[in-house]
């Protein structure tokens, strides 16, 4: 059996890192190929030859004859599109929300890999997930939330998030400033505004303290971080903005800060917090949701005051259920404690970081993922043979289209002539109605089986 992985492989968000980490790791244990749904103009900076071996296709929204349609394209480095017989593959779909990939009609075994930040899945999406053979989640908390909503416990597996190998402690650069570091997309869930307000109030009369932030948010509309701070009267010489830093810059800031700061209302995992712990950085966190899977044994936790609705109209955060409201008065106390007793907390975190790293390496968690899949389906290995290669007949990518079905699928043999008169051939599970809608009389298809 092969594993066809569907997810957001390209990009710089936490979930892009999550997807790449798992798919890269899984490829060491099983034959996989990947369908990606994100775009990143800077992907050449991190996509390597191993990635190119497993990245098979990408789903993009295209405008064809004034109609917005979802199209699948081969990647530019592929001379052939790779697939396997539909009876020999398992589908693994991972996305950070109720993404359209979850609604596709997959032939054969299918596994959902979901990460949720509130305590309640969207009911319609949950009904879709119930049709999957199993659902992999990151934490016990997420599993408990699913069970409370009536999800079959026997269909839930837990696989933890991984840590990038570039996360480890260093000898820090000397500085005359005590540096806090706050990371996360500005918004309601991450409680960025409230956290900055608390910091400024706490250290109003202490001069040797800085708060470094990387909190840019391009949605729903782009507002520069400096402008957001001005809107809420939070501009201060104590705040140092780092806008969309490259990975090496981000790590240099993280590894040289004194205390990492996070006080969010809901986390599926909290990758920045995990990376800070791996680097031996004393870390402040809110004591709720998914991050407790790995952070609860650390001392700088902030209590939860109450549950509040997750839905937040102003911030366009449309989650169901509830999230945790941190006690921001207690956050002020923890901030001061971490500042005054820094050497004690630094020693504790340095003592713990090597064990933490070994527990969450990508190699380990990817092996856990493989074991979970193999236990349910078996017959998965690196030695599987049988890739079917669908050759392209032109180097020009324009005009090569295929699409997967939301509804009734069939195996087809398709010939497509584009506007230049070029003829293309390909095979895949596609929805004939969608293809005919996109290409009209240009399409000739023969159904092989349903």
Question: Positions of the model-derived regions?
Answer:
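Extended catalytic core of nucleotide-activated donor transferases of GT-like folds
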Residues: 4, 48-147, 249, 432-436, ...
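N-terminal pre-catalytic "stem/leader" segment of glycosyltransferase-like enzymes
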Residues: 1-86, 399, 404
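Aromatic "clamp/platform" in nucleotide-sugar-dependent glycosyltransferases that forms part
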Residues: 265
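Acidic anion/phosphate-binding donor-loop and adjacent secondary structure
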Residues: 123-124, 162-178
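Conserved donor-binding/catalytic core segment of Leloir-type glycosyltransferases
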Residues: 4, 173-190, 196-199, 211-213
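Short hydrophobic beta-strand element within catalytic cores of glycosyltransferases
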Residues: 282-285, 300-303
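A charged, aromatic-enriched C-terminal amphipathic alpha-helix characteristic of glycosyltransferases
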Residues: 323-331, 340-371
